[in-house]
């Protein structure tokens, strides 16, 4: 390295030091303290204004919302259906009659799901009048009792295996909750089976009836102890084949304002599941 190169490097270093802090002008990174102060003040005011504007718009929007009832409910014209226990694969229940472990998971899932429906858990609920809406004005809201006895052979009371041990599996069907829904007519869940082998269905309560006393629903916050009405479907097979299966479709029926036909949603108000039982 030549003497000229060393001088050029020293000059560059001196210029950098001068840029970082100039003792003569008192500048730091090319600006005086006053200049830095004005810039910081500008950004403080600018971003403070943006934060205040965002907070105000959020506050104004929240004033239009109700903590207890959703503002927009017209996008859900009719409830869908769900089934329990939860199948291992999508809506396909498969088990072996000779292997208790293959259906033990279904039994455990049903017991867990029905736990809130026990006598002790329902002792503080209301014994409502059948056939009429249970409308309440608050501020306290209670729920109607749903006796497990309505599910008869699928209640788990007399048969803790819910029919699986005997080859007559039970599936529970329920409607999704919709706040303020008041079904017209006599709503029920109708289930039909389609299979190559002989299979028959038993529905509990009789005819899959859903009593009007379980409506309307007032929302999770107000109606926290609400129990959804259930319909149980028990499948029996008439053949002795090694593999017996049936395709079951359940849909809402008997209520004009609960739809089961929709071009955009082919599963609106209905659900289909398959049961396969191996020997």
From Swiss-Prot:
Pfam families: Na_K-ATPase (PF00287). Disulfide bonds join 128-144, 154-170, 191-250. It is a single-pass type II membrane protein. Gene3D superfamilies: Na, k-atpase alpha subunit. Its main location: membrane. Coiled coil: none annotated. The keyword Nucleus does not apply. Residues 186-279 are annotated as: immunoglobulin-like. GO terms for molecular function: ATPase activator activity; ATPase binding; protein-macromolecule adaptor activity; transporter activator activity. Residues 57-279 are extracellular. Residues 1-35 are cytoplasmic. GO terms for biological process: intracellular potassium ion homeostasis; intracellular sodium ion homeostasis; membrane repolarization; positive regulation of potassium ion import across plasma membrane; positive regulation of sodium ion export across plasma membrane; potassium ion import across plasma membrane; protein localization to plasma membrane; protein stabilization. It is found in: Apical cell membrane; Basolateral cell membrane; Melanosome. The sodium/potassium-transporting ATPase is composed of a catalytic alpha subunit, an auxiliary non-catalytic beta subunit and an additional regulatory subunit. Interacts with catalytic alpha subunit ATP12A. This is the non-catalytic component of the active enzyme, which catalyzes the hydrolysis of ATP coupled with the exchange of Na(+) and K(+) ions across the plasma membrane. The exact function of the beta-3 subunit is not known. The C-terminal lobe folds into an immunoglobulin-like domain and may mediate cell adhesion properties. PANTHER family: SODIUM/POTASSIUM-DEPENDENT ATPASE BETA SUBUNIT (PTHR11523), SODIUM_POTASSIUM-TRANSPORTING ATPASE SUBUNIT BETA-3 (PTHR11523:SF47). Belongs to the X(+)/potassium ATPases subunit beta family. This is Sodium/potassium-transporting ATPase subunit beta-3. It comes from Bos taurus (Bovine). The lineage of its organism: Eukaryota, Metazoa, Chordata, Craniata, Vertebrata.
């Amino acid at each position: 390295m030549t003497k000229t190169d060393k001088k050029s490097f020293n000059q560059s270093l001196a210029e950098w030091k001068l840029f970082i802090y100039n003792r003569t002008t008192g500048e730091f990174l090319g600006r005086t303290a006053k200049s830095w102060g004005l810039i910081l003040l500008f950004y403080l005011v600018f971003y403070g204004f943006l934060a205040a504007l965002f907070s105000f718009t959020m506050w104004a929007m929240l004033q239009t919302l109700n903590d207890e009832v959703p503002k927009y409910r017209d996008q859900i014209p009719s409830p869908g259906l769900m089934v329990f226990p939860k199948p291992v694969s999508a809506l396909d229940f498969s088990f072996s009659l000779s292997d208790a472990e293959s259906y033990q998971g279904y039994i455990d899932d049903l017991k867990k799901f029905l736990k809130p429906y026990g006598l002790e858990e329902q002792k503080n609920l209301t014994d409502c009048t059948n056939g009429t809406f249970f409308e309440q004005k608050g501020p306290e809201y209670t729920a109607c009792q749903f006796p497990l006895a309505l599910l008869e052979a699928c209640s788990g009371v007399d048969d803790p295996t819910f029919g699986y041990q005997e080859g007559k599996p039970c599936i529970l069907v329920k409607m999704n909750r919709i706040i303020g829904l008041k079904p017209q007519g006599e709503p029920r869940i109708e289930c039909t089976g389609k299979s190559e082998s002989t299979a028959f269905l038993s529905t509990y309560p009789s005819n899959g009836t859903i009593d009007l006393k379980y409506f309307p629903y007032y929302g999770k916050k107000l109606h926290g102890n609400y129990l959804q009405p259930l319909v149980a479907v028990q499948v029996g097979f008439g053949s002795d084949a090694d593999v017996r299966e049936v395709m079951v479709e359940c849909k809402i029926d008997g209520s004009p304002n609960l739809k089961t036909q929709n071009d955009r949603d082919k599963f609106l108000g209905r659900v289909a599941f398959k049961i396969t039982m191996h020997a």
